[in-house]
Amino acid sequence: MAKVISQDTFDDVVKENVVEFSMTPSEAKEETIKQFEAQGINLANIIKDLSVNPQTGQPVINETVDKIKEHIGQKLEETTELLEQLATLDAECKKSLAHRVLAGKNGAHDALITLLEETLSAESPNESVLKKSLEAINSLTHKQPDLFDAEAMAVVLKLLALKVESEEVTLLTLQWLQKACIMHEMNRQNIMNTSALKLMKPLLGKGKDRLVRELTAVFRFLVLDDDIRVEFGCAHEHARQIAGEVLITLVELLPAYQDPNVLADLLLTIGTLAVRQELCTAIDEAGGLKSVFEIMSSNLDEVRLNREALKLLRALAGQDSVKSHIVQQGVAPIIKQLLETHQSNENIVAAALACVTTLTLRVQEHSAAFFDTGIAEVIVEALRAHPKHKIVQRNGAWAIRNMVSRSRNQCETWISFGVEDLLNMAMKEHPSVEQDIKAALRDLGCSVHLREEWTGTAEKKIAA
């Protein structure tokens, strides 16, 4: 079994090489690695690329954390040195997860929290110190959500309630919350159990592009379900609670923005929060459908924006009356136009076909509305353009099946465009979606071999 050493032991030898033998940091590290490897020691657990102070031989990250701790409680008006130390810690933490773990072990998180608390307790908080501290704690918390604790949450609430001239402090606070949410269900639940949501709601408004994007990201991250350590998460309940506070506000913000990125984030967030039928109805009643159609029509060339719009429409169509309103208000020509404009983009094509699938499911009138736009030929051409893309072929088969299953009068038109050969080729190319394609061929009235997947064997023969 290979021998191992601690990071401190490795760092002490590097320091000795720098101080005692006047080596440069890079020479000292090389020599240390050779020494330990010659002794048969496994260095897999050691951070070998730590920045080292050439004067003291100490790792920069350790020295920086110690210097920040020294500043706490001194209440010095001169903050230049402190800001430099915070910038150094930020830069070191950005290098790798190993650097962040080491900083955390050396007490960087507690030091930054104490520094933030001390700064916030002042009569007029120093915004520069707040910004640099938040930048450092953002870098430190990245992929380390376990560091976020009750003290950190208390600081976040103070920061959200703080009236500052620059919105930079608020943006950094929201980014910190996002990092605390990723892959950590308990953090999400703890955040939802505080007044954070009520403090964030007033921040939503017109002309706040960056703020709206960061806020919507926090709302989405609060409804993640990505923590394998927790058997059951509260994603649905969180979505319901957040929707109750901000859903209508988000819908009302849609006409206020022109930036495609802001609009895409708003649409994505609305779709993420629309987890119940009554919420879908509320979005419809607030004029959400009209806004979405206007956004799609005036931004036909925007890939991400239209993909999110299609996903949102598909989510809203889960409520039958809203599904009817979507089709009645004229979505079919818009989706056809999108398919024509972005026929080479497999992501838009897949999203558009999935949307057609949902909107035409079990409703003959909806199928007719799409068919009358001439979308059949466009769908066939889209399938022809992406023969290797399994999701496009599967979604196309779904869309065709739903359109013709209650409208057999369409079959002849579909077949005249050569869809049968395309589907048969897709079935050979993508065996995993064979059943989906066979369902489309069956409802088109084409020849299809339906194989019996499983046959039982009876102990006694059943008479014919």
Swiss-Prot record:
Per the UniProt entry, what is one GO biological process? Answer: hematopoietic progenitor cell differentiation
ARM repeats at which positions? 235-275, 287-331, 332-374, 375-418
Coiled coil segments of this chain: none
Phosphothreonine modification sites are 9
Key word Repeat present: yes
The alphabetized UniProt keywords are: Phosphoprotein, Repeat
PANTHER family named in the record: ARMADILLO REPEAT-CONTAINING PROTEIN 6
Q: Which family does it belong to?
A: Belongs to the ARMC6 family.
What name does UniProt use for this protein?
Armadillo repeat-containing protein 6 homolog
Which organism was this protein described from? Answer: Drosophila melanogaster (Fruit fly)
